[in-house]
Every structure is written in structure tokens, then in C-alpha cells.
């Protein structure tokens, strides 16, 4: 052993005579820490002296192993190794860099209860995790990770030091030696289990708790109380000024079972640490984020999107509209009554091949008997992009309302080939053909202002939509003639009554649904008393096994309500 010490001393440029002690920082049972000044370089170093005279050869071999280990560890967040040897008095002298900032324990005392900013704590945590992960990847455990061994070279940087107990882990014989019991002692060591990588994670969690709360995680007046608190994980709550993310990460590191604690590598992949990892030195690419981190919807991004050329802007607007439509279909799948159409507006209307296109009814004005269908074009700018559920009032004059049926027929018969058409208004009898969802939208959007002009929209399959409307009208008239009833022409007051009842078919609250079902049963009972079984069958057909669509349900329900109201008024 003495020959190895002499060989080790010959390899070094300086000897102990080139240093003189400035002050003694700490004194322990088997080691002491000093601040020394190098006479030639005029530079301060931290010296750790381990007394080996009263120890066995095994402990001396451990000291030599530690010095060899220190020489191989090179990381920006580990205290820089300077020199080491064994002197003639069997003292292992280990020289490391000295930092004027002191250690974390002194920084907490100097703060005097003033909490550190959360950004700084996250930055320290990221650097400490990088240091611990570097040690673990080299099969090294620190075994003495406390705030006194976390040094502050700069305000926002930390380094791990004091590897007096660090050892290479032997897979066949795990490390089980610990010295004393401290506030950061892990539960598995108290149960005489081997000290492993997860034990360092526990100690790091205790350090982060102390940095955050300015007090130890586990504190008791006696040793029995301390062991009881550690085993039961009894901790005071962290200050409320810190985010739940930081608190959760500290709690994860302080889980009692080692298998439930995350590794340093897993903690480094936490999204909250990504911005701080980007500022670290010599960062491994595995910890870099896949996508660059930037604020969402920042003013710069909005300005860039608004300044896109016309072609890209139109494509983006149409893409956003399609996404909105898909989200609405997923939100209201029961009321979605249309299929995806593949026909183009530039092709004839006969090329639809039976595919249905969406034709939404936007707004109903209760003061008149007209219904206006409107929709925004894809050429509108991003600022004018409005949710498709938002509707508009009809602004036709009374003179225009009288000519509504003719305008409607002309639109659906003569202008079906056009790309951009001015959609007219639908007669009052076609209200029953509208899906309940659209009618409900009309009821819930009454507070919106009325626009002053109509909006031109592209419709690819107007002919098919007109066919549906015509079929619904024929179906209504045929059913009424079969019952020897006359055609009913809605007035404004009757329109409001019908709409208020049809609205209950939508997806409202449970009370409104119960009222609608009660109204349905009352009408069915009235039809049975009047022996109108055909109308009763038509009313109940949508609720059988061969149920029809919501559109047909609205048609039959409206027809029954109107005919019943007329008969009641006649009697």
C-alpha cells in the first residue's frame, strides 16, 4: 500500500507543501474538509482529507478506488476533479475546485425564509438530474446526496460534489454500507436493504424539498420519531406559491417503495423541464425535445398566418372549416343526417351519384313565415371565419315575402348548375322538412343581430336537396289528402308554436325531453279517441324497429300537431 502511495505521489506535479490551509470547513469522524490556497497558482481549492491510519486495508483500497473514480468523472454539473494522493501519514487527500458561492445549505440559511423563484428551482433540478443520471449511467451511486454537497459556482448553476461514499456498484454484491442516519436517509436502507440507484433519487427528492420549503422533509426531535416519519412518509405540505407540477415531481421522488420511484432519465423527460434542459451544457440529444418549444398562438404566429399568400390562406381556411364540421358531427352524431358528398360544384348536378350534401338551416325569424338558408364562403378571411352553428336572421321586406314560393322554385330548378348562387327562402310548409337540430339552432340564436344583406354561398348539389324538399312536400300533401284534410297554411303565430314544440326533439336537457314525450303521448291519445289510426301509425313509425331519419320524424310530428290544432280550433 505504501508503494502505491509513493507511485501515486510521484505522478503529481504538486505536493502538499505547495498548499497551505486557509480554513477548515467541516470536521467529521473519518474525514475533514479544508479550503487551501495553492502557492504557485494563487488559487483556492477544496481539500478533503480522509484518515486511513486507523482503518483496515479494505478501507484504504476503497479510498484509492474513489480517487481513481474521481479522475474519470467529467461532467459540467459535477465538481471538477483536480488532484489526489495519499500522504505519508496515511491520509487520502482529494483536491477539487472551490466555489465562492458556497453550498446549497448555506444559500438556504442566507435566504432567511425568502423562497427561491420556481424558474430557478426547475433549472437547478434539471442540472442535478443530469449529474445524477451521469453517475448512474457510469454505475456510480453518490450515497451522500445532501444540500451540503450541492455547490453553487454561479447563481443559476449547481454542481454535485463530496464523493466520500461514492462506489462502483457491483451487480453481484449491491452496496449495503451506510454511515449514520440523516434526514435524507431512504426507507429501504432503514430496513437493511441494499443501497441502489433509487436511493439517490430519494435523497435528491429530500434536497429539492428542502430547497423549496427551506426546511427538511422529515424532522423529529429524536431518532425514533425521525425513523417513524420516514417510514410513514409524513411530510408537511409544500408552499402554495409553487405549481402543482413541481410538487408532483418532488412527491414522485419521495415514494416509499423504490420500484415506484422514477429514474433520473424518466424525470428528465418531463415536459416541464424541457425549456431548462435546452439551456444546459453538453446536453445529450436524447433529452432534446422532438419539436421546438414555442408559445401557442403568439402574436408573431398570428401575424405570419394573416400575411400568407392568397392560395395558402384559402387552403388553410377551408381546412379549418372542414375540421370544424367534423368536430360538430362528432359532437351531434344523432342529428347528423347527411353523408359525405364527392361531387364538385363545377360538374352537373346529376353527377352526385346519390351522395347527400349538407344543407343547414341557419335562422328562423318568428315574426314572419319564411326561413332563410345561408352559409359563409371559403373565400372569407380568417377573421370572418365563424362557427357553422351561428345563424342569421332573414331581412326580406314584406313585398319580397309574398313572392317567396316562386323564387324558391326558380332557384332549385334553373340555377342548380351555378357555382355561386344566391340561396332564396323556403316556404312555410317546408319548415317541417328541416332537421330538428337546425330548428333548435334557430331558437337558441335569437339574440344575434340581423345582417343587412344576403350572403352568397357555393352549393355543389342543390338539385339533390331540392329533390328531398319536393319529396317531403308530396309526402305531406298525400298524407293529408288520404285523411280527407285540407292543406294547412301556416301563419306567423302558428309557426312560433310549431317551432317551440319541435325544438324539444333536439338534444336539450332531460326536463325538456320529458315534456316533449308527454306532449307526444297526449297527441297519440287524442288520435286514438278520434280513430285516426293512419295518422297515429305515421306518428309512431319513427320509433319502431324500422325507424326512419330525424327529418321524417319532424315531418310526421309537425303534420300531426298542425292537423290536431286545426281540428281543435274548428270544434
UniProtKB/Swiss-Prot annotation:
Q: Where is the active site?
A: 144
Q: Residue spans with biased composition (Low complexity)?
A: 342-351
UniProt enzyme class:
transferase
Keywords on record: ATP-binding, Kinase, Nucleotide-binding, Serine/threonine-protein kinase, Transferase
| Organism superkingdom | Eukaryota
Where in the numbering of this chain does the Protein kinase domain appear?
A: 19-277
Catalyzed reactions:
L-seryl-[protein] + ATP = O-phospho-L-seryl-[protein] + ADP + H(+); L-threonyl-[protein] + ATP = O-phospho-L-threonyl-[protein] + ADP + H(+)
What are the Basic and acidic residues biased-composition ranges?
Answer: 312-321
InterPro entries recorded for this chain? Kinase-like_dom_sf, NEK_Ser/Thr_kinase, Prot_kinase_dom, Tyr_kinase_AS
Q: Which GO terms describe its molecular function?
A: ATP binding; protein serine kinase activity; protein serine/threonine kinase activity
Region named Disordered: 298-321, 338-363
Which Pfam family is one of this chain's hits? Answer: Pkinase
PROSITE patterns, per this entry?
PROTEIN_KINASE_DOM (PS50011), PROTEIN_KINASE_TYR (PS00109)
- The entry marks the following residues as binding ATP, namely 25-33, 48
Q: Which EC number(s) does the record attach to this protein?
A: 2.7.11.34
- Membership in a protein family: Belongs to the protein kinase superfamily. NEK Ser/Thr protein kinase family. NIMA subfamily.
The job of this chain, per UniProt, is described as: May be involved in plant development processes.
This chain belongs to the protein called Serine/threonine-protein kinase Nek7
In which organism is this protein found? Arabidopsis thaliana
What does the record give as the organism's lineage? Eukaryota, Viridiplantae, Streptophyta, Embryophyta, Tracheophyta
Amino acid at each position: 500500500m505504501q508503494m502505491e502511495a509513493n507511485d501515486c505521489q510521484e505522478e503529481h506535479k504538486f505536493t502538499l507543501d505547495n498548499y497551505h490551509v486557509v480554513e477548515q470547513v467541516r470536521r467529521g469522524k473519518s474525514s475533514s474538509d479544508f479550503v487551501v490556497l495553492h502557492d504557485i497558482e494563487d488559487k483556492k481549492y477544496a481539500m478533503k482529507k480522509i484518515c486511513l491510519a486507523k482503518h483496515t486495508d479494505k478501507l484504504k483500497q476503497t479510498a484509492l478506488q474513489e480517487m481513481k473514480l474521481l479522475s474519470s468523472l467529467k461532467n459540467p454539473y459535477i465538481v471538477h476533479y483536480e488532484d489526489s494522493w495519499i500522504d505519508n501519514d496515511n491520509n487520502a487527500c482529494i483536491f477539487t475546485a472551490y466555489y465562492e458561492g458556497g453550498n446549497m445549505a448555506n444559500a438556504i440559511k442566507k435566504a432567511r425564509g425568502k423562497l427561491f423563484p420556481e424558474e430557478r428551482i426547475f433549472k437547478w433540478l434539471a442540472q442535478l438530474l443530469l449529474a445524477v443520471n451521469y453517475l448512474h449511467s457510469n454505475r456510480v451511486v453518490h450515497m451522500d446526496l445532501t444540500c451540503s454537497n450541492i455547490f453553487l459556482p454561479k447563481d443559476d448553476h449547481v454542481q454535485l460534489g463530496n464523493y466520500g461514499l461514492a462506489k462502483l456498484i457491483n451487480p453481484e454484491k449491491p452496496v449495503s454500507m451506510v454511515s449514520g442516519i440523516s434526514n435524507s436517509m431512504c426507507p429501504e436502507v432503514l430496513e437493511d436493504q441494499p443501497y441502489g440507484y433509487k436511493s439517490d433519487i430519494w435523497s435528491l427528492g429530500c434536497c429539492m424539498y428542502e430547497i423549496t420549503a427551506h426546511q427538511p422533509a422529515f424532522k423529529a426531535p429524536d431518532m425514533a420519531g425521525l425513523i417513524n416519519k420516514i417510514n410513514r412518509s409524513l411530510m408537511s405540505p409544500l408552499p402554495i406559491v409553487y405549481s402543482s407540477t413541481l410538487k408532483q415531481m418532488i412527491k414522485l421522488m419521495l415514494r416509499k417503495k423504490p420500484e415506484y420511484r422514477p429514474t433520473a432519465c424518466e424525470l428528465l423527460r418531463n415536459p416541464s423541464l424541457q425549456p431548462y434542459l435546452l439551456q444546459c451544457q453538453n446536453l445529450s440529444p436524447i433529452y432534446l425535445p422532438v419539436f421546438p418549444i414555442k408559445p401557442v398562438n403568439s402574436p408573431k404566429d398570428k401575424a405570419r398566418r394573416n400575411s400568407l399568400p392568397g392560395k395558402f390562406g384559402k387552403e388553410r381556411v377551408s381546412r379549418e372549416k372542414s375540421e370544424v364540421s367534423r368536430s360538430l358531427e362528432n359532437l351531434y352524431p344523432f342529428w347528423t343526417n347527411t353523408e359525405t358528398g364527392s361531387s364538385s360544384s363545377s360538374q352537373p348536378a346529376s353527377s352526385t351519384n346519390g351522395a347527400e350534401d349538407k344543407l343547414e338551416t341557419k335562422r328562423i325569424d318568428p315574426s314572419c313565415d319564411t326561413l332563410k338558408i345561408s352559409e359563409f364562403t371559403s373565400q372569407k378571411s380568417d377573421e370572418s371565419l365563424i362557427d357553422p352553428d351561428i345563424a342569421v336572421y332573414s331581412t326580406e321586406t314584406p313585398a319580397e315575402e309574398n313572392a317567396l314560393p316562386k323564387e324558391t322554385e326558380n332557384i332549385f330548378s334553373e340555377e342548380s348548375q351555378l357555382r355561386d348562387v344566391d340561396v332564396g327562402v323556403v316556404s312555410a310548409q317546408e319548415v317541417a322538412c328541416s332537421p330538428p337540430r337546425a330548428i333548435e339552432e334557430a331558437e337558441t340564436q335569437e339574440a344575434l343581430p340581423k345582417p343587412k344583406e344576403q350572403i352568397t354561398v357555393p352549393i355543389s348539389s342543390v338539385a339533390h336537396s331540392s329533390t328531398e324538399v319536393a319529396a317531403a312536400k308530396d309526402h305531406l300533401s298525400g298524407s293529408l289528402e288520404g285523411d280527407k284534410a285540407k292543406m294547412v297554411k301556416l301563419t306567423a303565430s302558428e309557426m312560433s308554436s310549431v317551432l317551440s314544440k319541435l325544438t324539444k326533439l333536439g338534444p336539450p336537457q332531460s326536463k325538456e325531453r320529458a315534456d316533449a314525450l308527454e306532449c307526444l303521448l297526449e297527441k297519440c291519445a287524442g288520435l286514438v279517441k278520434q280513430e285516426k289510426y293512419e295518422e297515429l301509425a305515421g306518428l309512431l313509425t319513427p320509433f319502431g324497429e324500422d325507424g326512419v331519419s330525424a327529418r321524417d320524424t319532424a315531418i310526421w310530428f309537425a303534420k300531426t300537431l298542425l292537423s290536431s290544432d286545426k281540428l281543435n280550433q274548428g270544434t
